[in-house]
Amino acid sequence: MASTIQALPQEVVYLITAGEVIDSFAAVVRELVENSLDAGANRIVVYLWPQQWRVRVADNGCGMNLDDLQQAASAHSTSKIRSSADLWKIHSLGFRGEALHSLTTLADVEIISRAPENVGWRVVYGDNGEATQVEATAIAPGTVVTVSNLFASCAARRQGLPTTAQQMKAVQATIQQIALCHPQTTWQVWQNDRIWFTISPAATAGQLIPQFLPQLRPGDLQEIKLEIPNPENPQLSTNNKANATTLSLVVGLPDRCHRHRPDWVRVAINGRMIKSPELEQTILAAFHRTLPRDRYPLCFLHLLISPDQINWNRNPAKTEIYLHDLSYWQEQVTQAINQTLRISAANIKESVQTTRVSQLLKAAEEKGNYNFNPQNANPADNTQHYLKAVAQVSNTYIVAEHSGGMWLVEQHIAHERVLYEQLCDNWRLIPVEPPIILYQLSPAQVAQLQRIGLDIDIFGEQLWAVRNLPAMLQQREDCAEAILELSWGGDLQTAQVAVACRSAIRNGTPMSLPEMQKLLDDWQRTRNPRTCPHGRPIYLSLDESSLSRFFRRHWVIGKSHGI
């Protein structure tokens, strides 16, 4: 019986491979732009003609000589790697040698390029990636790649693509993600011969993000850059413990900005945005109980890791990777986020403006600024007072002074944050005698109280006896009401939040200066001092520069008197 298994024709193999790499306008832009960045370009111009199925990418990179141009679109041809060992030494964005050849399978491709001190060349490629037309041409150093008649040989592919508007939205998102990983690059994007959008270069990703989210203000974001050692792994061929990893982190301060969706929880490794559910969940967990309900953080994590820690060869688009020692990196990310969200003297003077409160000062001065929330660094566990308690307003707010201005701290939610973190670190139940009697609990309420550790049993008809309770509730007169509140559902952390809220000092309670100072000191040492466990902001900041502008302290005396 003849075999039914046959080798596929070469053109079918190439078509299958091309479909894995190039599936949309965004994929074309991604592959060409990554080649530009690998060539050292710091200025990239993208032209799009979606109705004509044409894309052009021009850059000021190193360019190519004629020999490289003639080989550039050949199958499995690349300048990035030479052997299998190089798969663990990848420093470039591309390495597979598939993109340009795939494009010649699906479209008409032309490349014009010039290396410095060489003449420029124009090369047109055929379906198999071979150069069919070569001629000298005038061009500045760099490369221009034009892809025309995209998917002309695959009519079904064109029909299956989303609408033009959706494809252009995907292109914009792709360019923004790449720009975020390479903030020093200048971008200009044209659509149908009209400028569509530009991205100006920035020193860091944190300075670039406001171009994508214009509603943000610079002080809404906190950026940190850390050098951390690579983990020891004897299974790897090389062990670069001596070479540190760079961890760059940009977070939206939880009292300043958050999102309806987790669309800005982003992870990049070695210059490429990736999908890493594990690291994304680590980020979300680090912001737990710092944001309002059903809100998500703004966070961009970029790791520059030794290449031997990563396996890129898992997905043609290289968005999915295998990262060695994942738990180690998760721990480092958690520590970095915690460090970023804290408050210390190092940056207590820095603050940002809030629209809500700045209106108060605008009544007297159009440019007045009322500021909110300083940026952060490591907390200090010593007794140095970064904030000095000065007074209490309405038995609710603590006026605190520091070298750069003053803060207004809401005493109840500041104390709530302190107590909540203490409960998280030490959830302690103590026996009570006589027991607390509750009336008419449902089976679900009984099960909930038992779930969080309370000892409860039947005391009579429709009566239940609670024989222990959280230590913080021991001195309260409303213990029964507090336990009833705990019985209405939620996990242990929900119960801890409820206990902290019940136990915190109430607004309207007078406090002495030593009591206020003690609360300020305890609050500054918390892990997440910016918001209460419900996500509400804890303090307002009014810095010295705002006060000076408001009271016009920089005026010359003679001029202020009309002299």
Swiss-Prot record:
Keywords: DNA damage, DNA repair. GO terms for cellular component: mismatch repair complex. GO terms for molecular function: ATP binding; ATP hydrolysis activity; ATP-dependent DNA damage sensor activity; mismatched DNA binding. One of its GO terms (biological process) is mismatch repair. It comes from the Bacteria. Belongs to the DNA mismatch repair MutL/HexB family. This protein is involved in the repair of mismatches in DNA. It is required for dam-dependent methyl-directed DNA mismatch repair. May act as a 'molecular matchmaker', a protein that promotes the formation of a stable complex between two or more DNA-binding proteins in an ATP-dependent manner without itself being part of a final effector complex. This is DNA mismatch repair protein MutL. It comes from Trichormus variabilis (strain ATCC 29413 / PCC 7937) (Anabaena variabilis). The lineage of its organism: Bacteria, Bacillati, Cyanobacteriota, Cyanophyceae, Nostocales.
